[in-house]
Amino acid sequence: MNLPNKLTLTRILLVPVFMIFASLTGLSGIADGSFQPTYYLIAGIVFAAASFTDFLDGHLARKWNMVTDFGKFADPLADKLLTTVAFIYMMRDGVCSPVVLCIILAREFAVSGLRMVAAGAKDGKVIAANMWGKVKTVLQMITIIFYYFTVALTGNVLGQTCASIAYWLCWLVAVVTAVSGIKYLWDNRSFINTAK
């Protein structure tokens, strides 16, 4: 297994680490004084590190000519797992609307389903992420990192204000996610039309 693929697997392995620290405190703790900013900060650092591997694995794969079918399939899957889990915790905190999460999940299930159809087609095509998909992923990661770092660093002072900004960023994420999903399905509609 080459280094870019190892970085992709590392991103997947960092998901449960992020979950542990994100589970240890909640935004509701700001009101009753039980909020633990350190846990949010660690969760943010873990998420940022995992997000960096997304940039690094793609960069190295292209630079060293190590692009593989496994990487094309596993890299966006790792992104989906990482960001979706983070948005679930943000929904718990009341920062991410359930509607936003439903849009994200619907897009990811639809795209993943199409990828499986394409992989199982006669020519066995592996569909890589398009530009809209990459923009969507970057915006999702920026929103999540913004939320965890700003809330952790401002805590009781500006925590709720930062959370409100993150709330509207989540809606922007929903719009871009929906557009990227529609574009992806449209560009690969031949697999839908020929699916039996």
Specify the residue positions occupied by each region the protein language model found.
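Alpha-helical transmembrane bundles and membrane-interface segments of multipass inner-membrane proteins
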Residues: 1-196
